[in-house]
């Protein structure tokens, strides 16, 4: 019989069957082969203890009193085993039972641990191995019953533990990890077991191989009664351990206050060089603890392994401006940077809801133009997250709107990297950002907008505000060449005067996006259509098109469609082709309300439909802005000579003004 065979019988057998199996169990033959990493003990006494088979334990000890001194492969004494709650999932997997049973036990243990009923998992394990139903729903509906099971198991554990202690078991015996039974009892938050072990002389100052004390294990249990028991029963407890730090790290306010009032050190440091204050400032629920830690003289400028100070972490979490003021008044360096030269203000600038934190830091001396390791200032952090509120706040306090970072560029470049750049880009432009600023690669914001496939309204906003549609960067790339994957942007760029500088636009668009490819050829066809009477000029791209059958077939299709468009008369002076070839919005807005234009279905034109649609939309938008501006000026200048001018003269005057400036008039 192997250890796992005996274990199965321990789970499902009756008293007689279990004792009979133990009698036939040959420890010397099979125990030596037991893998040390397995969760199943190889001794009968430890198996019985692990499964809380109390009657079996008593019988075995009665037959052989020396069994209480037997240890398992991890040097766990019998007292260790009764104090440890076994990991039922490791056990059930080791037993290689049916997958359905494994899943049932897994879900049941999740529910029980959620309700802090870990001890009841032992009952579930035995039920599952015995073949009894332990479904998720059954366990979920039996929480009260499981609480009774837990109480019964804990009572049995106390009886066995006291019996072992009375028979002389070493209360401070250490396992391979140098843990004593009270370490495990404290970790479980088993207050009654802790009190029992303390009454028999358990040493709470024994440190394990991972440098943890009994109290630190108890702190992780978050059981305040267990923690009080350890503190109250041992006057010689070491108060310089990490107990207070761990309680704060666990955001356990009750335990933190108890340990603080008990005099535990506030200057402890963990392996990451964090102090209790580092953790306290990150949890809103612990805000009342911050002034208490400061009263004890904790180092307010202590840096962890990343170079972060408590103020830095508080700014990063963006809450409690009162405690931010308190920290700074107590000497916290408002500009203390981490190992990457990121300051508290950089961190606070990441979210709109941190506005109060940003203002507090700025009012108390934060450098609004501090630079990190990539030369990014706080406004770069706000821009890349499209935080308009923070952008405006930083600008109000003197942030450099043209600050240039090493890699990406200016604030406007960063804004285009965000997920929703429209409002932040608009804000920056309205506040004077240069739309043609260049980074070290000579790329403009328009280059980035094309690369990031920004929405059409963002592209148009840049172009309407003077972005150079033909700017070339250090890699000899212009916006149109970068945007060829995105035909919607290509259409806009061509409409705003993008030049077809070389054959790359043809070959790259053919490989990237067929719609872009058609737009390019259609645009060349328009140029040829406009210049048909200029014999001296030869378009080199046209020669390339004529030399390739694929290119040529699309060219001919565009040419025929353009002829069809030119046959549609708008009035006696203009045909529909004016909306294809002209970029003069002051001309087109006079034509856009023509009934023929309103009836045009742009989807009918395969090659020029999108171009027509864009042109009509821009003309319509121009007309609306002009009319709205005229009405607004009529209100403002009601008593002046302006009101006496004919409407068409007013429009003619306003046509000299761009859309951006007209919008400012409309918004007055």
From Swiss-Prot:
ANK repeats mapped onto the chain: 40-69, 144-173, 177-206, 210-239, 272-302, 306-336, 340-370, 374-403, 407-437, 441-471, 473-502, 571-602
Keywords, comma-separated and alphabetical: ANK repeat, Repeat
Database matches in Pfam families: Ank (PF00023), Ank_2 (PF12796), PRANC (PF09372)
Record-given protein name: Putative ankyrin repeat protein FPV244
Organism: Fowlpox virus (strain NVSL) (FPV)
């Amino acid at each position: 019989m192997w250890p796992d065979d005996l274990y199965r019988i321990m789970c499902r057998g009756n008293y007689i069957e279990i004792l009979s199996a133990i009698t036939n169990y040959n420890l010397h033959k099979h125990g030596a082969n037991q893998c040390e990493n397995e969760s199943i003990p190889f001794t009968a006494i430890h198996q019985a203890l692990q499964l809380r088979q109390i009657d079996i334990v008593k019988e075995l000890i009665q037959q052989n009193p020396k069994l209480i001194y037997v240890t398992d492969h991890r040097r766990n004494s019998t007292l260790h085993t009764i104090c440890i709650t076994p990991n039922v999932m490791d056990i059930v997997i080791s037993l290689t039972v049916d997958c359905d049973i494994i899943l049932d036990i897994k879900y049941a243990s999740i529910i029980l641990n959620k309700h802090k009923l870990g001890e009841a998992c032992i009952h579930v394990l035995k039920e599952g191995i015995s073949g009894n139903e332990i479904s998720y729903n059954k366990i979920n509906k039996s929480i009260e019953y499981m609480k009774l099971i837990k109480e019964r198991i804990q009572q049995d554990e106390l009886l066995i533990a006291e019996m072992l202690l009375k028979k002389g078991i070493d209360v401070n015996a250490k396992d391979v990890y140098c843990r004593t039974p009270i370490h495990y009892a404290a970790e479980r938050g088993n207050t009654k077991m802790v009190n029992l072990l303390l009454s028999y002389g358990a040493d709470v100052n024994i440190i394990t191989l991972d440098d943890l004390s009994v109290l630190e294990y108890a702190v992780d249990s978050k059981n305040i009664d267990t923690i009080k028991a350890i503190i109250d029963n041992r006057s010689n407890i070491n108060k310089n351990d990490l107990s207070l730090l761990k309680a704060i790290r666990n955001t356990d306010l009750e335990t933190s206050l108890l340990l603080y009032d008990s005099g535990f050190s506030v200057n402890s440091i963990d392996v990451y060089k964090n102090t209790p204050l580092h953790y306290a400032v990150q949890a809103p629920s612990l805000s009342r603890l911050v002034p208490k830690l400061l009263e004890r003289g904790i180092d307010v400028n202590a840096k962890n392994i990343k170079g972060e100070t408590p103020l830095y972490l508080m700014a990063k979490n963006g809450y409690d401006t009162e405690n931010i003021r308190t920290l700074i008044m107590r000497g916290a360096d408002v500009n203390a940077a981490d190992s990457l030269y990121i300051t508290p203000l950089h961190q606070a600038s990441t979210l709109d809801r941190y506005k109060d934190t940003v203002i507090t830091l700025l009012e108390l001396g934060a450098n609004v133009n501090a630079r990190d390791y990539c030369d990014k200032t706080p406004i770069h952090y706000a821009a890349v997250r499209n935080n308009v509120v923070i952008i405006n706040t930083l600008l109000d306090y003197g942030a450099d709107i043209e600050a240039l970072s090493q890699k990406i560029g200016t604030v406007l470049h960063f804004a285009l990297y965000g997920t929703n750049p429209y409002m932040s880009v608009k804000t920056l432009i309205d506040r004077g950002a240069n739309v043609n600023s260049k980074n070290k690669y000579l790329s403009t914001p328009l280059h980035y907008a094309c690369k990031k496939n920004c929405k059409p309204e963002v592209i148009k906003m840049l172009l309407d505000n003077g972005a150079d549609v033909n700017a070339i960067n250090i890699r000899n790339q212009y916006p149109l060449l970068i945007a060829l994957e995105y035909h919607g942007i290509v259409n806009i760029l061509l409409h705003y005067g993008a030049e077809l500088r070389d054959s790359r636009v043809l070959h790259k668009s053919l490989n990237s996006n067929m719609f872009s490819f058609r737009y390019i050829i259609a645009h060349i066809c328009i140029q040829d259509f406009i210049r048909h009477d200029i014999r001296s000029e030869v378009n080199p791209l046209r020669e390339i098109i004529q030399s390739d059958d694929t290119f040529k077939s699309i060219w001919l299709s565009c040419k025929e469609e353009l002829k069809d468009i030119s046959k549609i008369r708008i009035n006696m002076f203009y045909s529909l082709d004016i909306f294809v070839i002209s970029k003069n919005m002051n001309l087109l807005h006079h034509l856009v309300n023509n009934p023929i234009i309103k009836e045009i279905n742009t989807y009918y034109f395969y090659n020029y439909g999108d171009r027509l649609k864009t042109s009509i939309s821009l003309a319509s938008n121009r007309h609306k802005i002009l009319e709205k501006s005229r009405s607004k000026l009529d209100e403002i200048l009601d008593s002046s000579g302006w009101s006496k001018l004919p409407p068409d003269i007013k429009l003619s005057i306003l046509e000299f003004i761009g859309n951006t400036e007209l919008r400012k008039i409309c918004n007055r």
